[in-house]
Amino acid sequence: QVNVYNNGVLVRTMPTSMGMGGTQTVAGQTLTFWTPPGVYTVMDKSNPVVMDSSTYGLPVNSHLGYRETINYATRISPDGIYLHQLDSTVWAQGNTNTSHGCLNLNGDNAKWFFGFSQPGDIVEVRNTGGPPLSLQNNGDWSVPWAQWQAGSAPA
C-alpha cells in the first residue's frame, strides 16, 4: 500500500499494485519487472501520458507489451516508474503485484496523489523483493549519509 504523509502526519492510505517481479530477455537485453525499493523523488507529472513498452526494449506486440494512454501519472524515475491510474488492476491493488514496475492506483487515488504531490517530494518504496534502486534512476536519496559524505570533496 501507499502511505502518504504531510509533515510527518499520515494523510492517506492507498492500495497499490507494483512490479510483478521476474525478468525477460529480449534481443539480448534482460528486462526486469520489479519495482526497485529505495527513496525516490517526484520528478514530474503528466495527465495524460502515453506509456509504450517498446521505449525500454519490450515490443508492443509481445506477450507483456503495451502502448496505453494513462491518466494522472506522477513520474518518480527517469526510466519510467510512475504512480498512476490503472483501473484494470483495481482487483490486484492491495494484494497482488501485477505491473511492469509502476505503482498502479485506482482513479480517485491517482488523481488525489497527482494533485497533492510536488516535484521534489520524497517517495519511499519498500518490501518489493527486487534489486535496490540505482543512482542513475533517481536513487540519490537512497545513499546512506556516511557514504554520501565519503564521496564529497574535502572542505
Language-model-derived ranges and their functions:
Residues V2, V42, T74:
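Conserved hydrophobic/aromatic pocket- or pore-lining residues that grip, position, or stack substrates
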Residues T16-T25, S46-G57:
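Short regulatory "switch" loops immediately downstream of catalytic or recognition motifs
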Residues W34-P37, V49-A155:
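Exported/periplasmic cell-wall-interacting domains
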Residues G38, V42-D44:
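A structural signal for short, hydrophobic beta-strand segments that form beta-sheets
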Residues Q1-G38:
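Cell wall/extracellular polymer interaction/catalysis modules
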Residues N6-G8, M18-M20, D44-S46, D87, ...:
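A mature extracytoplasmic/lumenal domain signature
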Residues Q1, K45, G107:
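Residues immediately flanking
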